[in-house]
Amino acid sequence: MDDFNLRSENPNSSSTTSSSSSSFHRHKSETGNTKRSRSTSTLSTDPQSVAARDRRHRISDRFKILQSMVPGGAKMDTVSMLDEAISYVKFLKAQIWYHQNMLLFINDHETTSSCTYSPGAGEFGPKLFGYDDDYAPIMDTYSQGVPLTVADSKYTPWFGSVDDEQEHVTYFKYRRATRHALRGHCNCIIGETEEFADQREKMEVQIEESGKNQTSPESIEADKAKQIVVLLIGPPGSGKSTFCDTAMRSSHRPWSRICQDIVNNGKAGTKAQCLKMATDSLREGKSVFIDRCNLDREQRSEFIKLGGPEFEVHAVVLELPAQVCISRSVKRTGHEGNLQGGRAAAVVNKMLQSKELPKVNEGFSRIMFCYSDADVDNAVNMYNKLGPMDTLPSGCFGEKKLDTKSQPGIMKFFKKVSALPASSSNEATNTTRKADEMTANVRVSPVKLGSADIVPTLAFPSISTADFQFDLEKASDIIVEKAEEFLSKLGTARLVLVDLSRGSKILSLVKAKASQKNIDSAKFFTFVGDITKLRSEGGLHCNVIANATNWRLKPGGGGVNAAIFKAAGPDLETATRVRANTLLPGKAVVVPLPSTCPLHNAEGITHVIHVLGPNMNPNRPDNLNNDYTKGCKTLREAYTSLFEGFLSVVQDQSKLPKRSSQTAVSDSGEDIKEDSERNKKYKGSQDKAVTNNLESESLEDTRGSGKKMSKGWNTWALALHSIAMHPERHENVVLEYLDNIVVINDQYPKARKHVLVLARQESLDGLEDVRKENLQLLQEMHNVGLKWVDRFQNEDASLIFRLGYHSVPSMRQLHLHVISQDFNSDSLKNKKHWNSFTTSFFRDSVDVLEEVNSQGKANVASEDLLKGELRCNRCRSAHPNIPKLKSHVRSCHSQFPDHLLQNNRLVARAET
């Protein structure tokens, strides 16, 4: 066969295919193996069915491509051409087998001169290379003309030189790529055409069975390429159907569009019908687009369940301006679901009010946000060019850190719709911004309290395989083994193996072995990126990262260790020294990052776990001299320690209340009613945040309800009361709420850590309203405050706290201040701020508890104390102004006054 004469052709040229095809047909004519004659099948042509029309276009495009690839395909009908394609794939498979095993033969028999080994005519076959006879029928059919003895003069030059071996490698790769391309096009045509179900079954059996013995890592990874379920998320008019049609057109991956508007034989159907159609499409080997609005978790949940080890679930969020969506919906005609005209505007508005943006922890492996037409075009092109064996990186991409305001309401926008330009999305975007500034905004309902915004995730590098030179095969086995062992213990938490190199061998090995064991790829997967910039650059949210450290737990040494210490700054080294000074091989140490650490602030990383693995590098300490029995044992211990450390973090965080990254309402020194600057700020910003919640609770309504009012309250001063009575309306600012208590951040904290513990009881406006029957509530508030102190001190053990009440509060609703005594805050600006926390105007919680228990009420101090001189809270030295006072406080290390050191008024860690 000319096809096997490697000297006569360039495998990288286009002529290779024609050469092999002519050889193939010449062989078939010589052996009398002719094609079976079949009648031509035609495709359905129903002009009323959009789905059928799209299917015809896709089949036609694929058919033309396949005709150009299959030898003689241009002159064949569909059935014959598919049959020929199947045979051609088998032929290529035989060639792959042949060239792959020639490499093995060369490695075993290579000499300095031509090879003299000559197997007999009956020996040249799979058994010669130690294989079963699985390929024997193929070789019997297609290998006639191949020399049966390698001593044949025409083919003897194949053996003995490196150049020849390289030709085998090149030819092997080329044939496999051609085979995969053919399989993809056959899958599309047969999968799209119901008439060819029997050909599909035949092709699957013949092609897939022929590939069972191909075990190279590259082929395993290719054959395991996953189908994709893509959920399009957006209101009517956001362009979901257009996205699908454009992405599917001329795509090399077989797709199916699932649209509820036409799922019932061209008519509107149900969610259940969409699920069934999606399931059927996946079984047929297609990836699917879910063309529904999918605006909230409930709508998405059942479609996400379609994912698993075999399928990836992606989300494409079409977050276009509301005006653009409304304008498109109103103006369009002939819509599949008949949602057009004036009715469409109201529907869009109603849907937007219940919108919940998707999160990775719902089960998505990839989320992509599109805020403009350009973003949408990029996403369309990405999915359009995605081949049958291609994959996309996991993570969250394109998300902008927008405020929590949703798109403006239709009733306030509708008057402007007619003025919206017909087609310019840029102008529409500008209009949106103006409308946002002119109209009140409605908040999007966030996830229910208690559900984590981010799935607990550990990102870890491969331990010991870089500088410590541990064997990659053995290391990959241990990684997969330990990951599989711990996943069942971690609940919803995830493990992510990270490497900086896209061509990383350890990532490929682990990915292939995890796939073989059917490990859930949503909970354990690989990721390419910088482990110190996973969120900012890769869109992957990880709260814990592992560091492959050295025994001294010191920066330096290059690699991951140096990168993590550099990114975290001196805070990590200081925090590490609190936990340990050295580390033994096989051990790990969990280090909480302080909130001041750059990794904590920029990447959301709360903990670093240092782990030390075994060393096989003779130039590094504790070299094991290639003792892999001990090395594997130590590496297993290292991963066990690492995953157990992560498990402890997950369990500890699950016991603590959810914290919000957003700040909350303030009530501290700046809340004193005489502080005009504070009042202006609060009226200007806080009123916007609580206006909607106060609409039904106006000041007049409250006063007319018969509830006790200890003073006349300004409107802004009612914010704490509103939050305490209705915490579910303020989930963006609430850190924790119980039956009797709500915890929030102080909007303008006067120290590094400053939270408020609010009582939820009516008629408790301030300390003067407290009576003995409220003692249990006060004790509960005190205990909750201590819990938050403990949490903050876990982050930074040097912090010292004080818990107490202002004698005369500036905001309605009894609240306990939990404040660190560093007073390091830009929000502390004047004398009233300082004196409200450092004089007897501030009543310690322990004293209030004693007074209420003994005398039935708490003592309150005069507001005149706020006008006193400025004195250091430690040494009590006097200072003329706030800047000089703050400068002194930063450097003052004097002991606190005696009265604060008594009765547990100060809460500090024992080692402080």
From Swiss-Prot:
Residue positions binding ATP: G234, P235, P236, G237, S238, G239, K240, S241
Biased composition (Low complexity): 13-23
Protein name per UniProt: Transcription factor bHLH140
Underlying gene: BHLH140
Matches recorded under SMART domains: A1pp (SM00506), HLH (SM00353)
Subcellular location: Nucleus
GO cellular component: nucleus
Organism (species): Arabidopsis thaliana (Mouse-ear cress)
Annotated HIT domain residues: 720-829
Sequence ranges assigned to domain Macro in this UniProt record: 511-690
GO biological process assignments: DNA replication; purine ribonucleotide metabolic process; single strand break repair; sulfur compound metabolic process
Gene3D superfamilies registered for this protein in UniProt: Helix-loop-helix DNA-binding domain (4.10.280.10), HIT-like (3.30.428.10), Leucine Aminopeptidase, subunit E, domain 1 (3.40.220.10), P-loop containing nucleotide triphosphate hydrolases (3.40.50.300)
GO molecular function, one term: double-stranded RNA binding
